[in-house]
Amino acid sequence: MIEKEETMENKQDELKIMPRGAAPRSVRRGKNMIAVASGKGGVGKTWFSITLAHALSGYKQKTLLFDGDLGLANVDIQLGLMVKDDLGSVIAGSKTLNQVIHHCDKTRFDIIAGRSGSAGLASMPIGRLQILGEDLSLLASSYNKVILDMGAGVEKPVRILSSMAEKIIVLCTDEPTSLTDAYAFIKIMAMQYPKSDLNVVVNQANSIREGQRTYDTLLKACTNFLKINPPLLGIIRRDTRVRDAIRNQTPLINRFPTSEAAEDV
């Protein structure tokens, strides 16, 4: 639990966020685009993005998963894929987004892989990031759902691309650092992009009841300090079979379709 909610409020000084009146220009949100973000790394964001995309494809939703995790891209690794072209090729200007789409047979959805170890997105000017987001918005019209697996933290690329999604899912766990950083992400997005549709998913909960307590702690801080109430979309219970699936580079829904975590997603 968070001992002092004021520690969340003090994150403003560390983030050096823009004043409310200095928000970036209005953005064009891509219909059917869902950004998955978290203030802290290590909360299972990429696994959740993959599993969500897999679940949607199982309901005959044409789905694209975009790996936007900056220099720590690993969607293709978790899926056991070897891709020739990735987002790095798009940033370099040698390929278009359409040309780096790969179909994953084992999950029945498409992916745009990131490039691990590359600072490409992090170093892109704001204008090019916005163009990339607009290209993604156009691409989204060819799909029922596009999942954006964003990097941890509140860096510029994460904020800009997340703002272009129709819905933002903030993933957190019960760890105090995860809750504090999730609050920081919600705060900066709410201030810079007040029309953002922010939602919460609690991951790795020991039980549904504990997951609800985790959400209530975050909600209390958001209500008291930000005057907003991001809704809870769901709680995913802690499941040791998730680690097994990741180690075997096999989607959880394929390997353990009746597991608690798979059912919760």
Regions found by a protein language model. Name each.
Residues 1-40:
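Extreme N-terminal, non-catalytic leader segments
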Residues 29-69:
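Walker A/P-loop phosphate-binding motif and the immediately C-terminal alpha-helix
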Residues 57, 162, 190:
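Gly/Ala-rich phosphate-binding loop of Rossmann-like dinucleotide-binding domains
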Residues 65-141, 246-251:
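P-loop/Walker-type NTP enzyme "switch/lid" segment
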Residues 138-141, 155-176:
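Inter-motif core of Ras-like GTPase G domains
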Residues 173, 198-212, 235-242:
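G-domain G4 guanine-recognition motif of GTPases
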Residues 180-193:
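Conserved C-terminal guanine-recognition region of P-loop GTPase G domains, centered on the G4
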Residues 225-256, 265:
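Beta-strand-loop-alpha "switch" segments that mediate conformational coupling across diverse proteins
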